[in-house]
Regions:
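Active-site beta-strand/loop signature of hydrolases that rely on acidic residues for catalysis
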Residues: 3, 17, 25-54, 74, ...
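Catalytic metal-binding/acid-base residues of hydrolase active sites
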Residues: 9, 42, 86-87
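A short acidic, glycine-rich active-site loop
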Residues: 55-68
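Active-site catalytic loop in hydrolytic enzyme cores
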Residues: 60-62, 88-124
């Protein structure tokens, strides 16, 4: 299996990040990659480092045009992808990695799991 890792500098503009994602999918497919993996929260700057900022403009659902666009690009380019989006489900927001197959179908989901507040355990 040939895996492409998308190295992106994210902008505050979702559309710019989306277009860059589509471009990277095409490039990975042209180079015969089977799967392309994207960075955390790929359509926005990495905002978790700024806990007080308003990030509502970056929230989406799996039905958003951006997720559908990535799915279409996978189908058109015959490549699997693992994009990462800031998703809202049932009133909760978190980043979620999807696994999209080469037919554009979502075949896997992984929600972010944060272990904040857990005490460090002793290792021997």
């Amino acid at each position: 299996m040939k895996i492409a890792l998308a190295q992106m500098k994210m902008d505050t503009d979702i559309e710019k990040n989306f277009q860059k994602s589509l471009q990277l999918i095409c490039e990975a497919a042209e180079k015969k990659a089977d799967l392309i993996c994207f960075p955390e929260i790929q359509l926005s700057p990495f905002f978790p480092q700024f806990p007080d900022c308003d990030v509502s403009e970056y929230v989406m659902t799996e039905d958003s045009s951006y997720v559908k666009g990535i799915r279409n690009a996978c189908r058109e380019n015959h490549i699997f992808a693992s994009p990462n989006f800031y998703i809202e489900e049932k009133g909760h927001r978190y980043d979620m990695s999807l696994l999209i197959d080469d037919q554009g179908e979502i075949i896997g989901r992984q929600n972010e799991i944060v272990n904040n507040g857990w005490q460090v355990f002793q290792t021997v």
